[in-house]
Amino acid sequence: PKELNKILKDDSSEKPFIVDVREDDEIAIASFSFSVLHLPLSKAANWSAKIGELLPKDQPIVVVCHAGVRSLNFGIWLLEQGITKRVWNLVGGIDAWSTDVDQSVPRY
């Protein structure tokens, strides 16, 4: 989380495209203060066929969830589908973001 925060604040670094795979009820509890693409995994049938259109080809992608497990699996899927070669998982998810970077983000 601290490394991502540093990248987001550094004007000279390439900004990642952030995908949040948590569910709607989780987003309602805790959300990031910056822009993310929300793709809840439970609704993958609605967006999986057009995933290549939803994600940028020229930006690194950071995938997030609550603790980092669902986002890790989604990141692996993106690699397997050939969608991107530059994908990272936010280890610890929004929970770690809350403890390590922004304590105003509620924990659940």
Regions found by a protein language model. Give the residues of each.
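Rhodanese-like catalytic fold shared by cysteine-dependent sulfurtransferases
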Residues: 1-17, 24-60, 69-108
